[in-house]
Regions:
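Short, conserved beta-strand element in jelly-roll/cupin
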Residues: 17, 26-42
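Short histidine-centered beta-strand/loop micro-motifs
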Residues: 6, 22-28, 44, 68-69, ...
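Short beta-strand His + acidic residue motifs that chelate non-heme Fe in jelly-roll/DSBH
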Residues: 42-43, 59, 65-70
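Conserved short histidine dyad/triad with adjacent acidic residue
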Residues: 9-28, 60-61
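Structural motif
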Residues: 32, 39, 64, 72-74
Length: 98
């Protein structure tokens, strides 16, 4: 579902992945990420969690979420309804290999 200025009334479901990358954003809606494969770290509100295949991580509406995968993570994301408020992309970073 492409973004529309008026928002959306139903949850939106999509797949995404990180490969030795970090992504930080802020959404006006709740965001749930189900880890399909790999290892994902999520930091929001001063709390960091580590998630593996089968785990779900929730970032509340309005909160900044930072997501990173030291090697690889494949995710299924669910965005809650949105009344048309914009999301903010706060940063992307390629992680260095050690």
């Amino acid at each position: 579902m492409p973004p529309v200025p008026s928002g959306w009334s139903e949850p939106v479901l999509f797949e995404w992945e990180l490969t030795a990358e970090s992504w930080t954003d802020q959404h006006p809606h709740c965001e749930y990420n189900f880890v399909i494969q790999g290892q994902l770290f999520v930091e929001s509100g001063g709390i960091t969690v580590e998630a593996h295949a089968g785990d779900v991580v929730r970032v509340p509406a309005g909160a900044v979420g930072r997501y990173w995968a030291p090697t690889y993570a494949r995710l299924l994301a669910v965005y809650g309804p949105n009344t048309g408020e914009p999301s903010r992309s706060l940063g992307y970073q390629k992680l260095s290999k050690r």
